[in-house]
């Protein structure tokens, strides 16, 4: 089996095991509303990075990070028990910044849409600076120019 495929499967299993263990066994009051979003394992299967998000402010994020650090041993033992790999990967917990960045991008897009609507409203009542159609060909003036000189 390909090492990358095995690492991907192990990462998926670690994600599930960590999420279930946090829900059922870890009873730390500092642990807020945490969601395990992703897990990645190195090709040698020795280290796993677990990404998480927390509902709340930066204080809740810091408290959850401390709770995850203190529960790291229990989580690693459970991962080893349920995955039955020769070497249980070392767990590293990293806050996932994707939801925060997505929210910022959505806010920027909303501002851009509002600015576009404002420009469209202004364009409806705008008047040209010069003639309404500067390239319009006036037929009467052209008829005088087309007559041959006698």
Curated annotation (Swiss-Prot):
GO terms for biological process: maturation of SSU-rRNA. InterPro entries: KH_dom-like_a/b, RbfA, RbfA_dom_sf, Ribosome-bd_factorA_CS. Keywords: Cytoplasm, Ribosome biogenesis. GO terms for cellular component: cytosol. The keyword Cytoplasm applies. It is found in: Cytoplasm. The keyword Calcium does not apply. Monomer. Binds 30S ribosomal subunits, but not 50S ribosomal subunits or 70S ribosomes. One of several proteins that assist in the late maturation steps of the functional core of the 30S ribosomal subunit. Associates with free 30S ribosomal subunits (but not with 30S subunits that are part of 70S ribosomes or polysomes). Required for efficient processing of 16S rRNA. May interact with the 5'-terminal helix region of 16S rRNA. This is Ribosome-binding factor A. It comes from Acidothermus cellulolyticus (strain ATCC 43068 / DSM 8971 / 11B).
């Amino acid at each position: 089996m390909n090492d990358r495929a095995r690492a991907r499967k192990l990462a998926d299993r670690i994600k599930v095991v960590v999420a279930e263990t946090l829900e059922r066994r870890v009873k730390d009051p500092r642990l807020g509303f945490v969601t395990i979003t992703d897990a990645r394992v190195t090709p040698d299967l020795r280290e796993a990075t677990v990404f998480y998000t927390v509902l709340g402010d930066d204080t809740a994020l810091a408290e959850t990070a401390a709770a995850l650090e203190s529960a790291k041993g229990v989580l690693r033992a459970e991962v080893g028990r349920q995955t039955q790999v020769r070497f249980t990967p070392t767990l590293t917990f990293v806050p996932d910044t994707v939801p925060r960045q997505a929210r910022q991008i959505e806010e920027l897009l909303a501002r851009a849409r509002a600015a576009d609507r404002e420009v469209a409203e202004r364009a409806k009542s705008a008047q040209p600076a010069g003639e309404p159609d500067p390239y319009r060909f006036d037929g009467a003036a052209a008829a005088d120019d087309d007559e041959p000189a006698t």
